[in-house]
């Protein structure tokens, strides 16, 4: 798999931060408004969302006027799904387990305790039918989901008492 080609495609398709040059507007560039579930400059997740948006603008070579909004700047963090689903913005960057209230299946497209490792998850998405399931689920809300990174397998939990049974 060509990593650069994949990253370029994911960046152009998925979306996130910074304003494109005014020349993009003058050239008739398409507006791409991206909202995030994370605060601006939040280490790791927030800063990577900003970098992704900047890269989309750069790789689009004037085709996109990219406008990025961190959590709370355009909509609240947990309103980003509905913002994009309604058509008010074109993309969001977040973790799909935030949307389990809409459908519990969204958890499987992020990370769950004791779940798959990042390589296992990527293999399932690309080769094991995961993307097709994700397309079906996200498509029912008018969205197209794309993987834009991974924080890895989530921990099983932190408890103040020893667990001795499933109960």
Question: Predicted regions: what is each one?
Answer:
Residues 5-26:
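N-terminal export signals
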Residues 33-51, 71-76:
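Extracytoplasmic "Venus flytrap"
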Residues 54, 95-167:
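Contiguous mixed-secondary-structure segments that line small-molecule binding/active-site clefts
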Residues 62-64, 80-94:
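Alpha-to-beta junction loops
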Residues 66-68, 145:
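Generic structural signal for residues in well-ordered beta-strands
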Residues 68-82, 151:
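Short helix-initiation/N-cap motifs at beta->coil->alpha
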């Amino acid at each position: 798999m060509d990593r650069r080609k994949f990253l370029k495609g994911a960046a152009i398709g998925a979306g996130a931060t910074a304003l494109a040059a005014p020349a993009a507007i003058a050239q008739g560039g398409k507006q791409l408004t991206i909202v995030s579930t994370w605060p601006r400059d939040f280490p790791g997740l927030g800063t990577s969302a900003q970098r992704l948006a900047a890269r989309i603008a750069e790789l689009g070579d004037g085709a996109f006027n990219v406008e990025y909004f961190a959590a709370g700047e355009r909509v609240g963090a947990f309103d980003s799904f509905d913002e994009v689903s309604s058509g008010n913005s074109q993309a969001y960057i977040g973790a799909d387990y935030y949307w389990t209230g809409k459908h519990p299946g969204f958890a499987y497209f992020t990370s769950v305790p004791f779940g798959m490792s990042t390589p296992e998850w990527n293999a399932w998405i690309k080769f094991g039918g995961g993307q097709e399931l994700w397309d079906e689920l996200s498509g029912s809300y008018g969205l197209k989901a794309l993987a834009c990174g991974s924080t890895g397998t989530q921990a099983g939990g932190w408890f103040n008492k020893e667990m001795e049974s499933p109960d």
